[in-house]
Structure formats: C-alpha cells, structure tokens
A protein has these predicted regions:
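Short loop/beta submotifs within extracellular cysteine-rich repeat domains
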Residues: 2-3, 55-59, 65-69, 103-107, ...
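A general structural motif
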Residues: 78-79, 87, 126-130
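Duplex nucleic acid-engaging cores and interfaces of nucleic-acid transaction enzymes
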Residues: 1-63, 67-68, 79-80, 84-85, ...
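Conserved small/polar residues in nucleotide/adenosyl-binding loops
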Residues: 175-182
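Conserved, well-folded catalytic cores of nucleic-acid-processing
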Residues: 11, 26, 67, 115-121, ...
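Acidic/polar low-complexity surface segments
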Residues: 71, 121-123, 169-174
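Surface-exposed interaction/gating patches
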Residues: 44-56, 93-103, 128-163, 178
Length: 183
C-alpha cells in the first residue's frame, strides 16, 4: 500500500490519532510490517526485503509506482513466515542480517538479483531449526553498528569486523550467550 503524507489527518499533540487500517484497505490477515518514505519511484532504486525464515528479495522500486486501492503484492510468503524488514537501496549496498542465535551475515546486495513483485525471494542467511531472522540493516562498511540484546546489553562494533560473504551462509557470531526477542 502507499499513502501520501498529506492524506493523513493533522491532529493535536495529545490526540490519539486515526488507525492506519481506516486509511488503508487491509484484509483481515494483513498488517503493516514496515513503512518506507518514498519521494519518487526511481528506476535506479530497489526495495530490499527480509523475512523471518531468512529469505531476502530485491525488487525495483519503480514496480510499485502505480497506486491500487487494494494494494500491491510485494512478496509471496509461506504460512509460517513474515516480513521482518525492508529498506530502499541503490543496488550495491552492504546488507546485514541478524539471527536470534546472535549471528550476523554481511553480503553485498549485488548477490541478490532483482525479482518481480510476486517472487518468493532467495536465501539470505541459513538458519537452524529454532532460529529466526530478527533484523535487516543496510550499512556503510566504514561505520559502526549497535547491537542490543533483549536483556539490555549493548555494544558497538565496526561493520568491517564482520567479513563480507556470499548470501546464504550462517554468518559470524555477533553475540554469545544471548537471548534475543522472537517475532
């Protein structure tokens, strides 16, 4: 779905606001997973998506340029899967996926080919049976990332400390003896 900001009603600081379901034509089994600000639907930009089961998908942003009242299908999901995160990318970004086991994989977005809107996607990270993907990040290799555990422990780590691999691996350990939130 997409909604122009001026279509959202202005409200006072203390007002409750208006439910998004009243502004979007969501089905009963649908919910809002993420919100992306888009000013123009460029041919040179992509929407990068990641699911709970470690699947990733890259779709050209221009494929979402037409507005439909019933929304536009962005990804096909299995019954027990759900969208964890989305990002607008250039096609050459560094992608980071973090798992509930404290592992993080870093790979270049170019390892994921552009797909149509209804495609399922490809494996971004290999997860064990009880693991889930908990975060999708797009990062600059010269920057640092902040990792925070469910128990409130946090640390900053240089992105370069995580080796860049091909997509589909298990990733490197970013946290040990850690309980991360499950979604």
């Amino acid at each position: 779905f997409w909604l122009k900001v001026y279509e959202i009603p202005v409200a006072s600081r203390t007002s409750k606001g208006r439910p998004l379901v009243n502004m979007l034509n969501l089905d009963d089994d649908e919910s809002v997973s993420d919100i992306l600000p888009v000013s123009e639907f460029s041919e040179n930009e992509y929407i990068f998506m990641a699911t709970k089961k470690g699947t990733t998908k890259k779709t050209n942003l221009s494929l979402f340029s037409k507005k439909y009242k019933s929304g536009i299908k962005a990804i096909n999901l299995d019954e027990d899967d759900k969208l964890i995160g989305t990002a607008i990318t250039s096609g050459e970004e560094e992608i980071l996926l973090a798992s509930s086991a404290g592992k993080l994989i870093r790979f270049n977005e170019s390892h994921v080919r552009p797909m149509g809107r209804t495609a399922r996607g490809v494996r971004g990270i290999r997860l064990k049976k009880d693991e889930k993907l908990i975060s999708l990040m797009v990062g600059d290799p010269s920057k640092t990332i902040l990792c925070v555990s469910e128990n409130g422990f946090g640390k900053k780590t240089k992105l370069d400390d995580f080796p860049s691999h091909n997509r589909g691996g298990q990733g490197a350990v970013s946290y040990t003896h850690l309980t991360l939130p499950t979604t």
